[in-house]
A protein has these predicted regions:
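Positively charged n-region of N-terminal signal peptides that target proteins for export
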Residues: 1-4
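Terminal leader/tail segments of proteins
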Residues: 18-156
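Sec-dependent N-terminal signal peptides
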Residues: 6-11
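C-terminal motif of bacterial Sec signal peptides marking the signal peptidase cleavage site
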Residues: 14-16
Length: 156
C-alpha cells in the first residue's frame, strides 16, 4: 500500500514538473514599409553613403534607432561579423548607429542582453536602401521593429 502511494505521489510530482517554454528568441519582429516621412537632404544622403561606402546597389544601410542602452548588438551575415558594438540611442535624434550591410545575403541582428534575434532577409533588403531597426521595450510581443524604406530620415 505504501509503495502504491509513493508511486502515485512520484507520478503526480513528475506530471507537475513540466518544462516551461521560453519565448526568448522565438518572437518575430514587427515589419513595416514606409516612405512617407520627412526626408534628409541629398547632401546628407550622399555624405552618409560615402562615409559607409554603401553607394553600390549591393549595399543597404542599417540604422539602429531607439531603445539601445549600451547592450551588445551583433550584426552578421553568413560571410562575416559586420558589427559588434554597444550602441546607445541619442535622445535628441533617436539614432544609435549606422551600419553598411550586404543586401545579397540574409543579415542577422542579435541582442546579447535580451538574447533576441532578428533576420533581415536579402529579398527585402535588396528592395530598400535604408533599414531602420528599433529595439522594442522588454515585455512586448516582439523584440524589434524593422522598417524598410528608400527614404533617409534626417540623422542630425
Amino acid at each position: 500500500m505504501k509503495k502504491i502511494i509513493a508511486i502515485l505521489f512520484a507520478a503526480f510530482l513528475l506530471t507537475m514538473c513540466d518544462t516551461s517554454k521560453s519565448a526568448k528568441g522565438s518572437a518575430k519582429p514587427e515589419v513595416q514599409y514606409k516612405d512617407d516621412f520627412r526626408s534628409a537632404s541629398e547632401k546628407e544622403k550622399s555624405a552618409l553613403l560615402k562615409k559607409l561606402n554603401a553607394t553600390g546597389a549591393d549595399y543597404s544601410v542599417l540604422i539602429l534607432t531607439q531603445n539601445y542602452k549600451g547592450e551588445q548588438i551583433i550584426v552578421s551575415n553568413e560571410q562575416k561579423t559586420l558589427y559588434k558594438e554597444y550602441p546607445i540611442s541619442n535622445k535628441k535624434t533617436g539614432i544609435a548607429d549606422e551600419i553598411r550591410i550586404d543586401n545579397t545575403v540574409d543579415t542577422k541582428v542579435y541582442d546579447n542582453l535580451g538574447k533576441k534575434e532578428a533576420v533581415l532577409s536579402a529579398k527585402e533588403a535588396k528592395k530598400h536602401k535604408y533599414i531602420y531597426l528599433m529595439k522594442n521595450p522588454p515585455g512586448g510581443d516582439s523584440p524589434f521593429r524593422i522598417t524598410y524604406s528608400n527614404t533617409l530620415r534626417p540623422l542630425e
